[in-house]
């Protein structure tokens, strides 16, 4: 019996040990028996691992009898192939989100278990991994694919209770946390939008309710004023009609405002609302009457509109009588006769106003014509002044020019200068002429300063005769303040008149001659240099040719 006793030896870390061994064998490329190629790069693997993880590789390797076959994978990137190899050898892989779709597609084509529908192993749901490591060293934004059955069971997929795991993928993968966050944000935004829309709708409804209540209050106020007016409304309307009927003058306006105030005061005990309305209408009519009366009663029309004003006053008296006759009727209620009379009088007032305006315009035109005629007449009647009349002063004017022409040069020399006679007079005359030249220079400067401003312009150029300006200032302030002028070894300072550009009067002819002489000299020197250069270049050749001949 002791020989039949058996002992069960269990390796607790069997799977992890095998996985680690396969990983080390793959890294060291030990005992590899096949090669996978993608994008010109190669990965060596073990047939056993490939057959265990993919039915596609299992059938493919069964038909191959070579010791070391090479499989070229089309439409698969090397990075995706490397990730699938890590997944098959270790059971998990870390990959970025943008590469997840391409990896799943390649796994579907190669029928990798756990990544495709045609698998016999457990399904895997992509789960974000906060702490993990892989061969590439990418830690952030990575997803872990684990070969477990718990994720599929959690998603609601029906799994067989028996040990058979050769079913197709059941259920759907759980969404990622980012998608859940996006959905939560969208739901919060929708709730916020709904709350905002509800608030806006409530505000709009409140505003419409307020508008409706305001309109109802206004209508009720109008109804109450109309009901409470009674006979006082007739008096107020009568007062307003009479206010519009009478002509627009300042005295009539004051009278009518007083009458409107009296009617409003009498109607106040009847109803306060009608009285206030009548007073407001009276004030409005008063303002309109004042503006129109100010526009009509101008200074140009006052003297010529007296006759028309008298006629208007006569019409006013007639209208006042008619209103006095119709007064009792208006107090009791509306009178059709008074209404027709007011309409007729309104037409009369309009006609009178039109006539007054026409008269004012015609008078203004006449005044303009009179002014033009008077101006023409004044231009025609212009006469020379008495100071220009030669006939009036012929008797008192003495002609001295004839006497100076008759006098000889000797007499002029004797008479010129001071009152002293003899030799001293001639000496003083010479000095007087020298001083006279200086005085002429000063007078010319003063005349330039006091010149008529009409002749002064920024574009004018003044040339002072017989002077040469050697110092020219670029700043206009210094140019206007001081300019140095040299003449006959004498320096004289004058100020330039008003904004004028003082330019010297030079002897341009001499300067042009000197310039032309200089240019001709330079030209001949240049030609001489060219001639010498040509001789130096050509003369040796000529001598050589002559010697050779």
UniProtKB/Swiss-Prot annotation:
One protein family per Pfam: BTB
Extent of Low complexity compositional bias: 162-175, 228-251, 263-293, 329-340
Principal location class: nucleus
Record domain BTB: where: 32-97
InterPro entries: BTB/POZ_dom, Dros_DevTransReg, SKP1/BTB/POZ_sf
Subcellular location: Nucleus
Ranges where the record places region Disordered: 115-200, 228-340
GO molecular function annotations of the record: DNA-binding transcription factor activity
Disulfide bonds: none
Highest taxon above the source species: Eukaryota
UniProt keyword list: Developmental protein, Differentiation, Neurogenesis, Nucleus, Transcription, Transcription regulation
Free-text tissue specificity from the UniProt record: Mostly neuronal.
PROSITE patterns the record matches: BTB (PS50097)
GO cellular component entries: nucleoplasm; nucleus
GO biological process, one term: axonogenesis
Gene3D superfamilies noted in UniProt: Potassium Channel Kv1.1, Chain A (3.30.710.10)
SMART domains: BTB (SM00225)
Function: Putative transcription factor required for axon growth and guidance in the central and peripheral nervous systems. Repels CNS axons away from the midline by promoting the expression of the midline repellent sli and its receptor robo.
PANTHER family in the cross-refs: BTB DOMAIN TRANSCRIPTION FACTOR (PTHR23110), LONGITUDINALS LACKING PROTEIN, ISOFORMS F_I_K_T (PTHR23110:SF111)
Protein name: Longitudinals lacking protein, isoforms H/M/V
Chain's gene name: lola
